[in-house]
Amino acid sequence: MVEAPRIRITYEKIRHTKNHRIVSISGPSYKRMNVDLIDYIIRKWWFAGKYIYLMLISSNKPTYVIRTHMMMHGRILVGNQDSPTKRAFMIIQLDNDIVLRWYRSQITLLDPNCLAEIKTNYTICTTRQAIMDSIKLMKYDLSNNRFDYNLFQSHLKNGINIHSSEIITDFLLDQEYFPGVGNILQQEALYDCKILPLKKVQDIDEPMFDCLCNSLKKIIDLLYESYKFRESGKEFGPILRIYRKSLCPLGHKTIRKKIGLRNRMTTWCPVCQL
């Protein structure tokens, strides 16, 4: 699954666990956090970009946030769902007997209370402002129901001015401006809008950026619907038109190579995209 719609679907499956208490928690990722989260309450879930966030509260105890990066194949399964061939990285059992299991994900504890700097693969010393910023990032996320078009446009204009000399491929992959957009989505949007991936940001006009934003939103929504159809056993037509294709939809031979500062493998049509 492509990251943005996959994260949204995962969030929709787990958000109902809000306000429930943790009665048991285990797994190698949790053990490396070096905290006791028994009896903590799930205050809220949210997602922004490529992360799902879980805020935990407990009376007279510090507040924590668990951030999950789903990686390429990560999953959070709910209830009786299990992965018999994979070991869970973290398991949380709640007071209503619901069990949450994390698989193949990067799980990090964000601690806004610490005084000394802590940074490992499992614990990061952060600030309350940084956590609030992650909540604000939802407003810029094209896959999020809290997406705010006007705020996004204002934020995007700032980014265009700052990164004018970058190629558009690198800019579309910048999570500060396009949270949740990955390599597949940016390639499809660039083909959809007939824009060369090597084109400089400063050479792309406002109608082109409008096309890119609308195309990204359209593709994300189509992928989301296709995954929902797949879960119910229904068929959904193909969506991706250029990613890893040897020919574009019009039959032109494509180019596939690593480009930009991020060195990401990119496919494009040298005839259709200018």
Swiss-Prot record:
GO molecular-function terms, A-Z: damaged DNA binding; DNA N-glycosylase activity; DNA-(apurinic or apyrimidinic site) endonuclease activity; zinc ion binding
Record's keyword annotation contains Hydrolase: no
ZnF (FPG-type) intervals: 241-274
CDD domains the record matches: FpgNei_N
Source organism, top-level taxon: Viruses
SMART domains, sorted: H2TH (SM01232)
Gene Ontology biological process: base-excision repair
Keywords: Metal-binding, Zinc, Zinc-finger
Family label: Belongs to the FPG family.
Alphabetical list of PANTHER family matching this protein: FORMAMIDOPYRIMIDINE-DNA GLYCOSYLASE (PTHR22993:SF9)
Record's protein name: Endonuclease 8-like L720
